Amino acid sequence: MSDEQTTHFGYEKVDVKDKARRVAGVFHSVAAKYDIMNDVMSGGIHRIWKQFTIELSGVRSGHKVLDIAGGTGDLTKKFSRIVGPTGQVVLADINESMLNVGRDKLIDSGVAGNVVYTQADAQYLPFPDNTFDCITIAFGLRNVTDKDLAIASMLRVLKPGGRLLILEFTKPQNALVEKAYDFYSFKILPTMGQIIAQDADSYRYLAESIRMHPDQETLKGMMDAAGFAQTKYHNMTGGIVALHTGIKP
C-alpha cells in the first residue's frame, strides 16, 4: 500500500478504509464502561478540563451548539442548560453504541427538549453551511482518519464569528511528566482497561493514538491552514491535555 492509501491506527499502519471500522470496534467495546474509565484513568480531572472548555466557549442562551464525538454527553448536558429553551445542542457521534449510551444517560438525568442526537462523521458533517454558533470536539479528533478534512468541515458549518474548541490529549511539556505519563499510559492504563472494561487492547490503542496525534503547534497550524482566525491553545495538567480554540472569520 502507498502512503496515500494508509493511515495510523495507533502505531499500526492500516488501509485508510479500514481505520474507521477498527476505531468503531474500539468504541463499541468500551461504550458501556466509558464514563467509569474516564473517571478512573484521569482521577476525575477530565471534568475540570471539560469545565474549562465550557467557560471558554462563549456559549449563551439561544445559541446552537454542535458537540462532535459527544459520546456520553458530558459537554452536551452542560451546554443544554446554558442555551436554554430557545437554543439547541446537537450531540453528534459516529459510533452508534456511544450515541445510545449518551442518549440514555441524558434522558435519565432529565435533559430533553433542546438536544438532538445525530450519528455523523466529523469529516462529512451533514449540516448546512453557517449553522452553529459553537462547535466542540473533546477527545475525538485523534480518532478521525483525515483530521484536515474534519477541521475544514467544522469551519464550513460554523457561523461567521463562531468558535471551534478542540479538547485533546497531547504532548506533555516537561520531560519528567512525559516519562511518567508514558509509563502510566502503556503499563497502567491497559491493565485498568482489562480489569474494568475487560478490554486491554482498546486502551492500548488509546495510548498509541495519543502519541500519534499532532502536537500543540502542529494542530494550531492545521487550524490556521483551514482558515480559522485567532487560533490559540491552552495547556492543562502539564500539557497532557490542550484546548485549542479558533474563530471562523
From Swiss-Prot:
GO MF annotations, alphabetized: 2-methoxy-6-polyprenyl-1,4-benzoquinol methyltransferase activity; demethylmenaquinone methyltransferase activity
Pfam family, one: Ubie_methyltran
Keyword line: Menaquinone biosynthesis, Methyltransferase, S-adenosyl-L-methionine, Transferase, Ubiquinone biosynthesis
Superkingdom of the source species: Bacteria
Enzyme Commission number(s): 2.1.1.163, 2.1.1.201
Pathway, per record: Quinol/quinone metabolism; menaquinone biosynthesis; menaquinol from 1,4-dihydroxy-2-naphthoate: step 2/2; Cofactor biosynthesis; ubiquinone biosynthesis
Binding site for S-adenosyl-L-methionine: T72, D93, D121, A122
Reaction(s) catalysed (UniProt annotation): a 2-demethylmenaquinol + S-adenosyl-L-methionine = a menaquinol + S-adenosyl-L-homocysteine + H(+); a 2-methoxy-6-(all-trans-polyprenyl)benzene-1,4-diol + S-adenosyl-L-methionine = a 5-methoxy-2-methyl-3-(all-trans-polyprenyl)benzene-1,4-diol + S-adenosyl-L-homocysteine + H(+)
InterPro entries given in the database record: SAM-dependent_MTases_sf, UbiE/COQ5_MeTrFase, UbiE/COQ5_MeTrFase_CS
GO biological process: aerobic respiration; menaquinone biosynthetic process; methylation
Stated family: Belongs to the class I-like SAM-binding methyltransferase superfamily. MenG/UbiE family.
Purpose: Methyltransferase required for the conversion of demethylmenaquinol (DMKH2) to menaquinol (MKH2) and the conversion of 2-polyprenyl-6-methoxy-1,4-benzoquinol (DDMQH2) to 2-polyprenyl-3-methyl-6-methoxy-1,4-benzoquinol (DMQH2).
Name of the protein in its database record: Ubiquinone/menaquinone biosynthesis C-methyltransferase UbiE
Encoding gene, per UniProt annotation: ubiE
